[in-house]
Amino acid sequence: MIADKNKLTLAMARACLNPQSLAKAAEMPPQTVNGVLRGRSVRPATLGKVARALGVDPADIIKEV
């Protein structure tokens, strides 16, 4: 799964989180969050953790094909 960078950045802004604080909130290494932000494909569970930390539904940040 790939996150939509624009949707993810907007959700981060709404939650007042930078990549480092998002990583801490999602309980994952900052490198993983940076990979998500760069458009790398990640496991659904990883995207789910990011979405939960942002308080959004995973479908809200998934890149549409």
Where do the language-model regions lie?
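Short, basic-rich loop-to-helix N-cap that marks the start of a DNA-contacting helix
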Residues: 39-52
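A short, Lys/Arg-rich alpha-helix, primarily the initiator
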Residues: 1-21
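Short alpha-helical "recognition helix" segments of helix-turn-helix
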Residues: 22-23, 50
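Short C-terminal boundary/hinge segments that cap the last helix of small helical domains
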Residues: 55-65
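Residues within the alpha-helical elements of helix-turn-helix
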Residues: 14, 25, 53
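Recognition helix of helix-turn-helix/homeodomain-like DNA-binding domains
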Residues: 28-42
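Key DNA-contacting residues within the recognition helix of helix-turn-helix
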Residues: 34-35, 48, 62
